[in-house]
């Protein structure tokens, strides 16, 4: 048991949509790089740990109205980094993702350039999971649903 492990704040998002053919729901999943130390190679919902920049940016773009501020912003950032999808924007150009991942542009600039209209009513808090205490690295993860 490792009860003294510091919990790492993180956020995960389940992006769902109606299937165009089957009348069921489709859920976005991504495959993690095999060299990542936590769940490497697994298929997962987009998500990750809160970065320091998330704290400042969540205030500047008014993510705090949801009561989850930095966690909502983290979920937004992670789904974009991992899949290229900008929630609240139709068909954001791939160039933004490539530029962000190569540190040529900040997420703040992506938000501005893509004219993202945040509709936080569609990002619904869904669950909170904490990694069991027998793991050496533990996360306090909030899950959000977005359609």
Annotated model-derived regions:
Residues 1-147:
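N-terminal leader/linker segments that precede catalytic domains of diphosphate-processing enzymes
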């Amino acid at each position: 048991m490792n009860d003294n492990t510091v919990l790492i704040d993180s956020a995960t998002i389940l992006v769902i949509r109606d299937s165009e053919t089957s009348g069921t729901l489709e859920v976005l999943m991504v495959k993690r790089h095999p060299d990542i130390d936590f769940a490497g190679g697994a298929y997962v919902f987009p998500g990750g740990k809160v970065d320091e920049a998330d704290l400042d940016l969540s205030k500047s773009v008014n993510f705090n109205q949801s009561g989850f501020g930095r966690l909502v912003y983290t979920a937004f950032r992670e789904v974009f980094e991992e899949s290229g999808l900008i929630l609240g924007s139709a068909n954001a150009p791939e160039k933004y993702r490539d530029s962000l991942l190569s540190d040529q542009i900040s997420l703040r600039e992506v938000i501005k350039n893509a004219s993202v209209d945040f509709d936080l009513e569609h990002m619904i808090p869904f669950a909170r999971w904490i990694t069991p205490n027998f793991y050496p690295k533990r996360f306090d993860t909030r899950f959000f649903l977005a359609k």
